[in-house]
């Protein structure tokens, strides 16, 4: 799984001119699933995101997690995180899982985060979405569970 996480003051996602998800202080997670991802990958990624200490403490140091600051989560599925641009000018997305696999994994990710007590909003899988956010920092971090299998997590 791949995720781009952004610390936000607020964020929202709109489908067909209707806001389908919005949060205040917290993290926007752009999430993609690969064909080889497992439930274990999903849980490890969610735990990493929820516990990353990327929110400031009283001394303005990164020392608080989303859980610590009772922040919120907005999860938006984005298969384009698996774009392969090595050949030609049109990206290939063969590294992304098919919707039949990806959609339940994204749903499980959201359910897991909610199960950890995190207020979690989401976009609409497969829809054309407009995402608005106010970056806080900015703080943007890329996570890839495939790298963790090789000792880089």
UniProtKB/Swiss-Prot annotation:
InterPro entries in UniProt: Daa-tRNA_deacyls_DTD (IPR003732), DTD-like_sf (IPR023509)
Enzyme class: hydrolase
GO CC annotations on file: cytoplasm
Catalyzed reaction equations: glycyl-tRNA(Ala) + H2O = tRNA(Ala) + glycine + H(+); a D-aminoacyl-tRNA + H2O = a tRNA + a D-alpha-amino acid + H(+)
Lineage: superkingdom: Bacteria
Pfam families with a match to the protein in the record: Tyr_Deacylase (PF02580)
Alphabetized UniProt keyword annotations: Cytoplasm, Hydrolase, RNA-binding, tRNA-binding
GO biological process: D-amino acid catabolic process
Motif (Gly-cisPro motif, important for rejection of L-amino acids): 137-138
Subcellular location: Cytoplasm
Function of the molecule: An aminoacyl-tRNA editing enzyme that deacylates mischarged D-aminoacyl-tRNAs. Also deacylates mischarged glycyl-tRNA(Ala), protecting cells against glycine mischarging by AlaRS. Acts via tRNA-based rather than protein-based catalysis; rejects L-amino acids rather than detecting D-amino acids in the active site. By recycling D-aminoacyl-tRNA to D-amino acids and free tRNA molecules, this enzyme counteracts the toxicity associated with the formation of D-aminoacyl-tRNA entities in vivo and helps enforce protein L-homochirality.
Domain commentary: A Gly-cisPro motif from one monomer fits into the active site of the other monomer to allow specific chiral rejection of L-amino acids.
Oligomer and partners: Homodimer.
Name of this protein: D-aminoacyl-tRNA deacylase
Top-level taxonomy: Bacteria, Bacillati, Chloroflexota, Chloroflexia, Herpetosiphonales
């Amino acid at each position: 799984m791949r995720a781009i996480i952004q610390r936000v003051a607020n964020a929202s996602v709109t489908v067909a001119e209707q806001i389908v998800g919005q949060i205040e202080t917290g993290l926007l997670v752009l999430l993609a699933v690969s064909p080889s991802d497992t439930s274990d990958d999903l849980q490890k990624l969610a735990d990493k995101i929820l516990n990353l200490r990327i929110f400031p403490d009283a001394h303005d140091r990164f020392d608080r997690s989303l859980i610590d600051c009772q922040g919120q989560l907005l999860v938006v599925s984005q298969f384009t995180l698996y774009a392969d641009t090595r050949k030609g000018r049109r990206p290939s997305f063969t590294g992304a899982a098919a919707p039949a696999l990806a959609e339940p994994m994204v749903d499980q990710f959201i359910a897991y985060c909610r199960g950890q007590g995190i207020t979690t909003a989401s976009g609409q899988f497969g829809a054309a979405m407009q995402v608005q956010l106010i970056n806080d920092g900015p703080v943007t971090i890329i996570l890839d569970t495939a790298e963790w299998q090789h000792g880089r997590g």
